[in-house]
Amino acid sequence: MKREVNLLKFYPQSKRPIDDRGNLITEQDRAIARKFDVEYFDGDRLTGYGGYNYSPRFWTDTVAHIKDFYHLDDNSKILDIGCAKGYMMHDLSLLIPGAEIKGVDVSNYAKENAIESMQDNIVVANANNLPFTDDYFDLVIAINTLHNLPLIDCKQAFREINRVTKNNSFVMNDAWRDAKGKQSMLNWNLTALTYMSCDDWEELFKEVDYKGDYYWFFAE
């Protein structure tokens, strides 16, 4: 498969200035953010979201697009890797109430503070060792997640996605196309440990035999 497709084209775009934030972030801020605890989700903007709360305006249109693109229905099994508090999972469940929707996240805080409808569907685990059987899911999604792993674990996470999905998967990772984009990404990055150009990501896909679809997050 391996299609480059922007499945988040309906997701609201941030208008925050990239370089201004980069001038303020310290390595201590990054270290705090990479714990993926309260400071990351509900602390200061320099260490994360500055308050990660549910709003239907973020995911409603995007999950409808994903549903149509992959022809999902009430018999589908869907996995969200890096699901955080389960907001996308929740909106998927509203749209496809019969689907089996699971989430994985490394953050105990995210699960403990997840939206109530999805809390029991979230497993605290690492993407490089997914606690599911082979070929279980009809769709596996990992949006802005795998790049938070060290390179060796990131590669293994792609192999795990191949293992647990029957056919379909979609990943989005930090990337750049040119030198300006690279500098903006370095300024913007808070949690990513594996980030590279689009061309280098595509070489990695070949190395791990990633079979799914993909797109990029650009710091623009």
Question: PLM ranges: what are they?
Answer:
Residues 1-70, 77-131, 149-156, 160, ...:
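Class I (Rossmann-like) S-adenosyl-L-methionine-dependent methyltransferase catalytic domain
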Residues 145:
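Hydrophobic adenine-recognition pocket in adenosine-nucleotide-binding enzymes
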Residues 141:
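A conserved beta-strand element that flanks and buttresses the S-adenosyl-L-methionine
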